[in-house]
Amino acid sequence: MKILVVGGGGREHAIIKKLKENATVEQIFALPGNGGIAKDATCVPIGAKDIPAIVDFAKRERIDFAVVAPDDPLVLGAVDALNAEGIPCFGPRANAAIIEGSKVFSKNLMKKYGIPTARYEVFTEAEKAIAYLQSAPIPTVIKADGLALGKGVIIASTREEAVSAVRSMMEDKQFGESGSRIVIEEFLTGPEVSVLAFTDGRVVRPMVSSMDHKRALDHDQGVNTGGMGTVAPNPYYTEEIAKVCMETIFLPTVAAMNAEGRPFQGCLYFGLMLTPDGPKVIEYNCRFGDPETQVVLPLLESDLLTVMQACASGTLADVDVRFSAGSACCVIMASKGYPGKYESGCPLTLPEDDADGFIYVAGAKQEGEGLVSAGGRVLGVTAVADDLPTAIQKAYERVGRVDFANGYTRSDIGARAMLALQK
């Protein structure tokens, strides 16, 4: 089979490495891919949002199956365009990808169908939002309606911060048209959990849970990033909580999308808060998370391509989706300065992958015979083990074997999970 993967980050590298385990896969193309992915797939310099060029390439190469990984092409209708040419795809159509593409849509969906989430208000005018904030409880959460590279959510701990966030989104157009509507919602407390789920539009098969570390610096200090590391499973996410989430969140969400005429097929990401009142949805994503994918897929024992094809064909009920009982840890190596200004072009020397350790390449390109940094988040250094403490230790040992002079990591990925295990 010839497989096409749209995207070019660490998440896509993890997907490609897993797809390669299927013996029927003869060739994988990555559009655009990156310098590290080039070891595992044929990279083609076509942008992930250039849907006409992606479709032309897929037709020309007679692609048997496509995986559209990033949010932008999903929201823009890449799956619709490929399906129209008879190419089966893993990923939702545009009318279902709106569950991530519009925070207003997703909040209204949850309200309509009784799916637990934070209380909220929607605003299209900055002055009305600012007037509302004068009496809103603080801290509060301000969200841009549209896609904003994972940076469109501000937790404001003072009224001044909240007003500033509204002005930057709605008046200064920090996120372009994505901030022309905003959601202001109640600040929830409790442990956060990420759960990715395979779905064919009816059946839901949750993956192993994970814990993200979004802040740039140790002890959850600094600004929000796309994610500085992950561990799986998340010790706060017990079997009992998993059952509650399946009954009150996962299945109702998929049923709600069907009822709205927007059947969702692909990977549905649930960002959850385990509040004193029970699990609530913080956000939905219409695709695999990054870097959650880098810990979840190494623990998948079932064949990824088979599961993806079942999601696309509506036959997920017939497929066994199994995960190992082990643990995984991914430590992101970023360019110094990320998520602010950083330098690119720093040479990278990486250890070889082995049975329990891998490096997923995100922001890097080939230069001459080697790799150099070419982004903020550069590498996802991952290890798997029978237990979480060992996985964390192995991941940091592997970080120590990477030559990346301009790289930095958080030193405490997994520390919160370890505390939870000790309770």
Locate predicted features.
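Short, charged, surface-exposed secondary-structure boundary motifs
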Residues: 38-41, 55, 98-104, 217-218
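Generic C-terminus detector
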Residues: 364-368, 373-423
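Internal nucleotide-binding/catalytic subdomain
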Residues: 152, 156-293
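Solvent-exposed alpha-helices and their adjacent loops that cap or buttress functional pockets
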Residues: 21, 36-38, 90, 112-114, ...
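ATP-binding N-terminal substructure of ATP-dependent carboxylate-amine bond-forming enzymes
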Residues: 1-94
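Active-site nucleotide/adenylate-binding loops and adjacent lid/helix of ATP-dependent enzymes
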Residues: 4-5, 100-181, 235, 239-251
